[in-house]
Amino acid sequence: MITRLSHLFLRTLRDDPADAEVPSHKLLVRAGYVRRIAPGVYSWLPLGLRVLREVERVVREEMNGIGAQEISLPALLPREPYEASNRWTEYGEGLFRLKDRKGGDYLLGPTHEELFALTVKGEYNSYKDFPVTLYQVQTKYRDEERPRAGILRGREFVMKDSYSFDLTDEGLTESYRAHRDAYERIFARLGVKYVIVSATSGAMGGSASEEFLAESEIGEDTYVRCLESGYAANVEAVKTLAPEPIPFDGLPAAKVYDTPDTPTIATLVAWANEADLGRTVTAADTLKNLLVKVRQPGGKWELLAIGVPGDREVDDKRLGASLEPAEFELLTEADFEANPFLVKGYVGPKALQANGVRYLVDPRIVDGTSWITGADEKGRHVVGLVAGRDFVPDGTIEAAEVRGGDPSPDGAGELVAARGIEIGHVFQLGRKYTDVFSVDVLGENGKPVRPTMGSYGVGVSRLVAVIAEQHHDDKGLRWPAEVSPADVHVVIANKDDTAREGAEGLAADLDKAGLEVILDDRKASPGVKFKDSELLGVPLVVVVGRGWGEGKVEVRDRFTGESREVAAESALSEIVKTVRG
């Protein structure tokens, strides 16, 4: 097919959009691929839609290749299935909820575990029907608090979600592995650099969980890996390597000191090093206690205290993952006033446990470790408070930040931190949803068998932005051939009728050879056409200009920047050979 730019619904922009922060957002808007409608909501224009459809094609081919079957479920869903699974409340404010004219509750689907489980229950009733894997490529909806980066994090997005149903755990493991392998093929074909990391399951539930993260400095997900062992995990899933307990026999008794004006870790450390405690004190010697309130779905707010070494910040994502499915909030001034035993800046374990506040600590706070922490009175701290002797926490929690240089959980070396964008996620859900909906089928022995599920997602529209993020330069986009909106971009760079006729003929021959061609036949200057060819990002640009009269055309590689002249009579075969490798 030949796409003429003189007819194409396209308007390129020379300036970056004011709200764009990341390269992919800037370039996709400037190149006329997408347009913003509202925060987190975008229209796909012709060339952008082509790229999106190419990504969908690759995903479908690989899903079909593992025997998955495509169906399509509605995006508008009734409340009842999600209430049965508790996700009506677990999803919190991220769920788009609405009512029909009769007052019935509905939602716009974020994922479809419930509906797929019910669909299989309604259609299959025998072990002979299994295993089965179903998938869809569909628009999803999530009410993101801060949609950003264009189509990277939107409120409306295209996703491939698939669900496997097996009768045994071994079967689930096989389905999981098949999807994992398929995802590796998908991302390889799309030219995406990625890592696979261990992850948490969150509101999805289930056990085994891995994320596919595209390597990117602008990614919202932080992951760590150990170069010595290959261990890799999203920071939310990292398990802290706890030290061995220390015998506390013979340790000096804890002592309370007056520490005026020391409500922060920095001021406390400064005081300690001026107080002649017999050693140099760092923030790592202090115990910081964070107060939050938590609420289980449908429950009431309760106080929770979290103790971490003073040199560590609490990571909200890690804390949220550890508390899942409960939600949490920091305490307000009103909360402190209602609980006068909580003295801001001076909270210690003693008052927490005396008043029945659940107290969870970082795994590094093991028996025998000695700490400087609040004494529950303004302007006073306790020095030498020993875990296991002077206070006994209610348990541990993974909430402290993970840093590069921390020991790897497998003990093989140090962790290296990097950032990435989630492009895929695979879960072994188990029987969470088949239990909720009593999905039973007749087993081979005549007894009921409950299938076990896997859930597997790929961010299809997000992948368009990820590819743009990883494949661009200061001139514009550089699409991998697998997803490019065309195979060849032919530029008529001369107003001469002979050059125009030559370009038209070459484009027609390329079309007959089965290539997708963009032909820039606009009445615009060569400079404008060249800039647009670089911005649009088709991997091969063919310039038909002054050289045509001498029997030559110029072939430019958008990725390498290299250009070469080829004879006009051999241009067709050279271009086809280049495109098809």
Swiss-Prot record:
InterPro entries named among the record's database cross-references: aa-tRNA-synt_IIb (IPR002314), aa-tRNA-synth_II (IPR006195), aa-tRNA-synth_II/BPL/LPL (IPR045864), Anticodon-bd (IPR004154), Anticodon-bd_dom_sf (IPR036621), Pro-tRNA-ligase_IIa (IPR002316), Pro-tRNA-synth_IIa_bac-type (IPR004500), Pro-tRNA-Synthase_IIa_type1 (IPR023717)
Pfam families: HGTP_anticodon, tRNA-synt_2b, tRNA_edit
Superkingdom assignment: Bacteria
GO MF assignments: aminoacyl-tRNA deacylase activity; ATP binding; proline-tRNA ligase activity
Transmembrane segments: none
Record carries keyword Protein biosynthesis: yes
Annotated localization: Cytoplasm
Residues spanning the signal sequence: none
Domain characteristics, as noted in the entry: Consists of three domains: the N-terminal catalytic domain, the editing domain and the C-terminal anticodon-binding domain.
The protein's name in its UniProt record: Proline--tRNA ligase
Gene designation per UniProt: proS
